[in-house]
A protein has these predicted regions:
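Sec-dependent bacterial lipoprotein signal peptides
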Residues: 1-23
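Short, low-complexity N-terminal intrinsically disordered segments enriched in polar/charged residues
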Residues: 4, 21-46, 54
């Protein structure tokens, strides 16, 4: 075999291996982002806010505290009286290096859209979460209250 043909084959093989490794890392990140976002959503929308806050960045804790301060005992009773808990499904994940944008569909959740008023149960809604990678761990990064669009 000609030396240049060997060189081309070696470079091609190296490129293919690099793409395989990159896609494996990407698949690993996709799975980790999906698991984090779904676990956060399941806890957040079922008012298990302590468990949800563990999955957040440090700067998100003030927004978790803000949300918790606006949940009344009546809201908790309404959620607990539901036959089915809130369910979250991930519809899209867009990863860019150490950040990710996740689109989530939520079913059977408490909609708290006005301060000072009790929440109400909603059948279905959509929201978007931002996640950040901190020391190899994906965490939800809240920059304000979660905005949910009711469907």
């Amino acid at each position: 075999m000609d030396l240049s043909v060997k060189h081309i084959l070696l470079v091609t093989f190296a490129c293919v291996m690099a793409m395989c490794l990159a896609s494996a890392c990407s698949l690993k990140d996709d799975a980790a982002v999906e698991i984090c976002a779904k676990n956060f959503g399941q806890n957040y929308f079922n008012l298990r806010l302590c468990q949800a806050s563990i999955l957040c960045t440090e700067r998100s804790h003030k927004w978790m505290a803000f949300y918790a301060s606006n949940i009344s005992q009546e809201d908790v009773n309404v959620v607990n009286a539901q036959a089915d808990s809130a369910l979250c499904d991930i519809s899209d994940i867009d990863i860019d290096s150490d950040s990710a944008r996740v689109k989530m569909t939520v079913q059977n959740f408490l909609m708290c859209d006005s301060i000072g008023r009790h929440g109400r149960m909603c059948k279905k809604g959509k929201c978007e979460l931002i996640l950040r990678k901190e020391v190899e761990t994906w965490k939800v990064d809240l920059n304000g209250p979660i905005t949910i669009t009711e469907e």
